[in-house]
Design a protein with these regions (language model features):
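ATP-binding N-terminal substructure of ATP-dependent carboxylate-amine bond-forming enzymes
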Residues: 1-124, 137-145
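ATP-dependent carboxylate activation and anion-phosphoryl transfer catalytic cores
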Residues: 6-22, 27, 47-49, 72, ...
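Short, solvent-exposed coil/turn elements at secondary-structure transition points
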Residues: 33, 53, 107, 135-138, ...
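A generic structural signal for short coil/turn motifs at secondary-structure boundaries
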Residues: 56-57, 109, 166, 297-299
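Positively charged, low-complexity/disordered segments
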Residues: 412-414, 419-427
Length: 427
């Protein structure tokens, strides 16, 4: 029996354990001090302590995770998302230790992790990129002139950033200079890389991403699109597929562009290519590529009847896959995912750690409702980690039915909860 160590926690760890069980593989959970009795630990076949509650001393400690994998004789490591999922040094260490890395090659993670490099590679693959300037351009004397040519407002972004961190909208050149310095400092602290770049801010925009799976050797397929336009603080909260009110011809072009890009990179495994769609101009632009499983992957799984995590594991272990040809991948119906955060919307979405005293689970016995959750009633939500605790995914024959199913199964117990905010967004 193969043993898979999951280098993560919470709902994504639980989700990966589900695929391990489906494959009849042995799952290993890792945990910090505060996560000793967490759901992912209870759910796994085996578990091992990796350090203190601070992420830097546990879930971000590559050496401790690899040491744990060796101790329990794990065959492979699945990183999930967040933490070390897109850390090329961790991926390389895993490979060098003789353990299988469930993810793309480290050099791919490097090139896609730096948005400046990724933009250059996108251009070489004939993908349109949003008008902007790279990090080197910021040192040139004609910077103000070039910014005016792009046109304000402009988005200042950290080259190594992600999750909405290190992004600021500026409306004039004076504001831009201050923002660049501020973003550089923030990026250095958050990502260890102070490089920033500029991008034209498209006011009437949609955030569309294409789920791909690469097999190396210039081959990849897509699993259609996800619309992730409903966000707060540049972070997604509701995702759906298919994307509404965009011409299918444009979406097909986007998907084919994503496949071409992934193929040109000899990409291996699950990945997501993100685009900005200009509603007024009806044009799309390459944003970035995420070299990991996405939080919102269940949306895609729901409409394509696939298991992307299972595919990741099988591909890494050299097991034959079924969905390797584009004509075998079909979509059916409409799916909506709502992320549930332990936050207080009335206090600018401040995290709300504490004990879960009451948890009412919707009827997930229904085939059109799915709940990916990392907690049970009585569990403690910690302030050490991201406050997202669950995702509820509804599938209907069409968008209206899918949204209505979401509204039915997401109750509104009080006026000040993340659930009430999700209801507001759905309406």
């Amino acid at each position: 029996m193969k043993k898979i160590l999951i280098a993560n926690r919470g709902e994504i760890a639980c989700r990966i354990i589900d695929s391990c069980k489906k494959l009849k593989f042995h799952s290993i959970a890792v945990y910090s001090d505060i996560d000793k009795n967490s759901k992912h630990v209870r759910k796994a076949d085996e578990s091992i302590h990796i350090g203190a509650s601070k992420a830097q001393e546990s879930y971000l400690n590559a050496d401790k995770i690899i040491e744990a994998a060796k101790k329990l004789k794990a065959d492979a490591i699945h990183p999930g998302y967040g933490f070390l999922a897109e850390n090329e040094k961790f991926a390389q260490k895993v490979i060098d230790s003789g353990i299988i890395w469930i993810g793309p090659k480290p050099n791919t993670i490097v090139s896609m992790g730096n948005k400046d490099i990724a933009r250059d590679l996108a251009l070489k693959s004939n993908l349109p990129i949003c008008p902007g300037l790279n990090n080197k351009d910021l040192e040139k004397e004609d910077l103000e002139k070039k910014c005016n040519e792009i046109g304000f407002p402009i988005l200042v972004k950290a080259s190594a950033g992600g999750g909405g961190i290190g992004m600021q909208i500026v409306n004039d050149y004076g504001e831009l200079i201050k923002s660049v310095e501020k973003t550089k400092n923030l990026a250095k602290k958050a990502f260890g890389n102070s490089d920033v770049f500029l991008e034209k801010f498209i006011k009437n925009a949609r955030h569309i991403e294409i789920q791909i799976f690469g097999f190396g050797k210039k081959k990849a397929v897509h699993f259609f699109e996800r619309d992730c336009s409903i966000q707060r603080r540049f972070q997604k909260i509701i995702e759906e597929s298919p994307a509404p009110k965009i011409d299918r011809k444009i979406l097909n072009e986007m998907a084919q562009s994503a496949v071409n890009f992934a193929s040109n990179q000899n990409y291996e495994g699950a990945g997501t290519i993100e685009f900005i769609y200009d509603v007024d101009e009806k044009k799309f632009y390459f944003l970035e590529m995420n070299t990991r499983i996405q939080v919102e992957h269940p949306v895609t799984e729901s409409i394509t009847n696939s298991d992307l995590v299972e595919m990741q594991i099988k591909f890494a272990l050299g097991i034959d896959l079924d969905l390797t040809e584009q004509n075998k991948i079909n979509k059916n119906g409409h799916a909506v995912e709502c992320r549930l955060y332990a936050e207080d919307p009335s206090k600018n979405f401040l995290p709300s750690p504490g004990k879960i005293t009451k948890l009412k689970i919707p009827n997930i016995g229904l085939t059109n409702i799915r709940l990916d959750i990392g907690v049970d009633e009585g569990d403690e939500i910690s302030f050490y980690y991201d406050p997202m605790i669950a995702k509820i995914i509804s599938k209907g024959a069409n968008r209206t039915e899918s949204i209505n199913l979401s509204l039915i199964h997401i109750s509104e117990p009080t006026r000040r909860t993340p659930i009430s905010y999700a209801v507001f967004c759905l309406k």
